[in-house]
C-alpha cells in the first residue's frame, strides 16, 4: 500500500448539534482566512485535509438563523458597526480600538509589555501626555536603569578566574533572593553579583520614579536579572526592556519608553548607547566585580572578587548617585515659578551638574590631545571655567606630569595640582573630590 | 464559547500497542495528542469526551504501523466576535489591561474602558472609577465583550471591550 493516509480533523455529524457545526464553519470562514488547515498537521507523516469545504461567506447575513443562540445577533451588530477608527495600535494584528484585522506591521513593537502588542506614534504620545499628568501629580518622574556594570556584574561560570573560584562556595540561596547579592544561575551558566546598596537604592528611587530596566542583554537574561533585583515585581513589572525590544541596533532609545523625554532620567555606564539622549543620562562608574569584566574593558588589575573586596555599601557609587537623584527630584518639584508640565528634568540635571565644580578655574597642562576636548567639556559641564593661559584666577592645574612648566607654576603659586581623574571622579560622583586624593607625583 | 463537536483523526499506532488493550491505547494516545492543542479551525481542544467510532486499521508497508480513523467527541473552546466572556485580569497598565479566559489572551485597551475609570499607577496598577467604587486590577474577574478574534495555529488573540452595559468587574479580589 503506497497510498498516504489522510486524516480529517473536521466536524462530522454531531449528535449534539448540527447547527453549531454549521455556525462554526461559517464563522471560521468569515474570521480566519489565514488559518489554513495545513497548519494543524503536527505529525510528520500525517497529512490533514478538511473534508468539509469552507463555505464562502458573501455577507454576514448568511450566518443569521444558523443558531438559536443570541450570539449571532450580537455578532451582526459588532460587524455592521462602521467606525471611523484611526487604529491607534494592534494586538495580535487586530486594532486595539475597533478589533478590525490589520495588515502589515506598522507602529512600534511593545513586546516587553505583552507579546503581539504594537502602538502607533500618535497613540504613544497620547499615552505619554496623559501619563505625565498623573505621574507629576504623584511627584514622580521616570527612571531608566541599565543592568550590567550599573546595578550588577555578571560573568560566565567558565570565565571565573582561579582566584575567584572561592565564590562558588559563597553564593546565596535562590529560594529567597531578596536576602542575597551573589547568585549562581546554573541554567544560564552564569554568576551574578549585585552592586552593594542596590536594594536600598531601588527602594528609595521607587518613591521618586517610575522605573524601567533597559539592557543590551537579551530578554531571558533581562528577566532573570529583574527577578534578582525585584523578586516581588514591585518596581519593574512589565517594564523590562531588552535588546530584543529596541528599535535600533546597538542603541538604546526612549522611543519604547512610555514617558515624556523631559521627565526621564537614565542611569547607565555606557554613554554611547544613548546618543540621542545624553542630556537625560547620569553616567555611572562601572562596577567590575569579576575578572572577566575587568578584562573585557582592558584593565589588567585584579578584580574586586580577586581582592576579596567590594564597593562600600553606604558610600559607594549607588549611594552617591541616590543623593544626586534626590537633589534633582527635589529641585524639579520644589521650584514654584512655572507649571510642572513645562519643566524639564534635563535642565534640572544640567544645573545640578554645573554646581559640582562651580568656582573652579582650571588650566590643563600637557594633556594628551585626544583626551583634552572631552575632559574640557566635562569640566565645563560641571561648572568649572577652563582657561588656556595661566592667570591669577586659576585654582587648579590639571596635569599628568608634575614636571611641566604649568605644574611648577602651580606649586610656586600655591594652586592645586591634580590628575585628570579628579575631574572624572567629580563627574561620576557629582561632587568635588578632595584634591589630596589626586596628587600627581614627579616623574623620575 | 464551548462546543461539543465530533472530530476525526487518523491515529498511527506502533505494533507494540496491539492486543487486547488496543482500544485503550488508542484513546489515551488520542487524548495526549489533542487535548490542550489549539487549531485555527476549532479553537482549543479542552477535553475528549467520547469515542464515536474507530474505523478499520490500515497496515502500512514497511513500518508495520497501523492507521486507524478515529471519530471522537470533544469539547472545544473558541471565542467569537460579539461573545460575552468572563476573564481574569493578568496585567494592568496605562494602555489598558490584559485578561485570560482559559488559554485565550484578551486585550482591553483604555479606549474600550469606560471614560469614568482612570488609570492609577503604583505597585498595584489599576483602573478605578472617580468615586472609588469599582476597581480593575490584577486578578480581578471581568465580564467583557469580544470585538475581534485572531486564531492562529497555536494561539488565540482577542480584543475585548468593557465599554457597554453590564460589562466590567464581576468580582473584585480586593473586597474578598
Ligand atoms: Mg552597562
Ligand atoms: Zn481600529
Curated annotation (Swiss-Prot), chain B:
* GO CC aspect terms: P-body; RNA polymerase II, core complex
Answer yes or no on keyword Cell division: no
The entry lists its GO molecular-function terms as:
single-stranded DNA binding; single-stranded RNA binding; translation initiation factor binding
tRNA-binding: present as a keyword of the record? no
From the UniProt annotation, give the residues forming the signal peptide: none
SUPFAM superfamilies the record matches: N-terminal, heterodimerisation domain of RBP7 (RpoE), Nucleic acid-binding proteins
Query: Domain of life of the organism in this record?
Result: Eukaryota
List the InterPro entries hit by this protein, alphabetically.
NA-bd_OB-fold, RNA_pol_Rpb7-like_N_sf, Rpb7-like, Rpb7-like_N, S1_domain
Q: Which family does it belong to?
A: Belongs to the eukaryotic RPB7/RPC8 RNA polymerase subunit family.
- UniProt subunit comment: Component of the RNA polymerase II (Pol II) complex consisting of 12 subunits. RPB4 and RPB7 form a subcomplex that protrudes from the 10-subunit Pol II core complex.
Functional summary from the UniProt entry: DNA-dependent RNA polymerase catalyzes the transcription of DNA into RNA using the four ribonucleoside triphosphates as substrates. Component of RNA polymerase II which synthesizes mRNA precursors and many functional non-coding RNAs. Pol II is the central component of the basal RNA polymerase II transcription machinery. It is composed of mobile elements that move relative to each other. RPB7 is part of a subcomplex with RPB4 that binds to a pocket formed by RPB1, RPB2 and RPB6 at the base of the clamp element.
Q: Which PANTHER family match?
A: DNA-DIRECTED RNA POLYMERASE II SUBUNIT RPB7, DNA-DIRECTED RNA POLYMERASE II, III
The name on file for this protein is DNA-directed RNA polymerase II subunit RPB7
Amino acid at each position: 500500500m503506497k497510498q498516504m493516509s489522510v486524516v480529517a480533523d473536521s466536524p462530522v455529524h454531531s449528535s449534539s448539534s448540527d447547527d453549531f457545526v454549521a455556525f462554526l464553519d461559517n464563522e471560521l470562514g468569515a474570521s480566519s482566512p489565514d488559518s489554513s488547515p495545513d497548519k494543524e498537521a503536527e505529525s510528520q507523516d500525517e497529512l490533514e485535509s478538511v473534508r468539509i469545504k469552507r463555505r464562502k461567506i458573501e455577507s454576514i447575513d448568511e450566518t443569521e438563523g444558523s443558531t438559536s443562540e443570541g450570539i449571532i445577533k450580537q455578532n451582526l451588530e459588532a460587524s455592521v458597526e462602521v467606525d471611523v477608527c484611526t487604529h491607534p495600535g494592534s494586538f495580535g494584528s487586530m486594532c486595539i480600538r475597533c478589533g478590525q484585522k490589520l495588515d502589515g506591521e506598522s507602529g512600534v513593537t511593545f513586546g516587553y509589555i505583552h507579546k503581539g502588542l504594537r502602538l502607533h506614534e500618535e497613540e504613544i504620545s497620547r499615552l505619554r501626555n496623559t501619563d505625565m499628568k498623573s505621574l507629576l501629580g504623584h511627584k514622580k518622574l521616570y527612571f531608566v536603569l541599565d543592568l550590567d556594570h550599573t546595578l550588577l556584574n555578571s560573568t560566565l561560570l567558565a570565565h571565573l578566574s582561579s582566584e575567584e573560584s572561592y565564590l562558588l562556595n559563597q553564593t546565596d540561596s535562590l529560594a529567597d533572593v531578596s536576602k542575597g547579592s551573589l547568585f549562581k544561575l546554573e541554567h544560564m551558566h552564569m554568576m551574578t553579583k549585585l552592586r552593594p546598596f542596590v536594594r536600598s537604592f531601588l527602594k528609595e528611587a521607587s518613591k521618586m520614579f517610575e522605573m524601567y530596566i533597559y539592557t543590551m542583554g537579551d530578554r531571558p537574561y533581562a528577566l532573570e536579572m529583574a527577578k534578582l533585583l525585584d523578586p516581588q515585581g514591585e518596581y519593574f513589572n512589565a517594564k523590562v526592556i531588552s535588546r530584543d525590544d529596541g528599535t535600533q541596533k546597538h542603541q538604546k532609545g526612549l522611543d519604547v519608553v512610555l514617558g515624556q523625554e523631559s521627565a526621564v532620567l537614565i542611569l547607565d555606564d555606557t554613554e554611547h548607547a544613548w546618543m540621542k539622549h545624553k542630556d537625560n543620562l547620569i553616567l555611572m562608574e562601572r562596577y567590575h566585580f569579576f575578572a572577566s569584566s575587568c578584562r573585557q574593558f582592558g584593565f589588567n588589575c585584579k578584580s574586586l572578587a580577586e581582592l576579596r573586596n567590594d564597593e562600600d555599601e553606604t558610600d559607594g557609587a549607588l549611594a552617591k548617585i541616590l543623593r544626586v537623584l534626590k537633589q534633582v527630584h527635589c529641585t524639579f518639584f520644589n521650584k514654584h515659578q512655572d507649571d510642572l508640565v513645562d519643566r524639564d528634568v534635563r535642565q534640572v540635571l544640567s544645573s545640578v551638574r554645573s554646581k559640582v565644580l562651580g568656582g573652579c578655574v582650571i588650566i590643563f597642562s600637557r594633556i594628551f590631545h585626544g583626551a583634552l576636548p572631552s575632559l574640557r567639556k566635562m569640566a565645563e559641564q560641571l561648572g568649572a571655567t577652563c582657561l588656556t593661559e595661566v592667570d591669577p584666577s586659576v585654582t587648579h592645574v590639571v596635569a599628568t606630569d608634575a614636571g611641566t612648566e604649568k605644574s611648577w607654576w602651580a606649586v610656586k603659586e600655591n594652586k592645586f595640582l591634580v590628575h585628570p581623574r579628579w575631574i572624572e571622579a567629580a563627574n561620576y560622583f557629582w561632587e568635588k573630590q578632595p584634591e589630596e586624593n589626586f596628587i600627581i607625583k614627579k616623574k623620575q | 464559547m464551548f462546543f461539543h463537536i465530533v472530530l476525526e483523526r487518523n491515529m498511527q499506532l506502533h505494533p507494540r500497542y496491539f492486543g487486547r488493550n488496543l482500544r485503550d491505547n488508542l484513546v489515551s494516545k488520542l487524548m495526549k495528542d489533542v487535548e490542550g492543542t489549539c487549531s485555527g479551525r476549532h479553537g482549543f481542544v479542552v477535553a475528549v469526551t467520547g469515542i464515536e467510532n474507530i474505523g478499520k486499521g490500515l497496515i502500512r508497508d514497511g513500518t508495520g504501523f497501523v492507521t486507524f480513523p478515529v471519530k471522537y467527541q470533544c469539547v472545544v473552546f473558541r471565542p467569537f466576535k460579539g461573545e460575552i466572556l468572563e476573564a481574569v485580569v493578568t496585567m494592568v497598565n496605562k494602555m489598558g489591561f490584559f485578561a485570560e479566559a482559559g488559554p485565550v489572551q484578551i486585550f482591553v485597551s483604555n479606549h474600550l474602558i469606560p471614560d469614568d475609570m482612570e488609570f492609577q499607577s503604583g505597585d498595584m496598577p489599576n483602573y478605578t472609577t472617580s468615586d472609588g467604587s469599582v476597581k480593575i486590577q490584577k486578578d480581578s474577574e471581568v465580564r467583557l465583550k469580544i470585538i475581534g478574534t485572531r486564531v492562529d495555529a497555536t494561539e488565540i488573540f482577542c480584543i475585548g471591550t468593557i465599554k457597554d452595559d453590564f460589562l466590567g468587574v464581576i468580582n473584585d479580589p480586593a473586597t474578598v
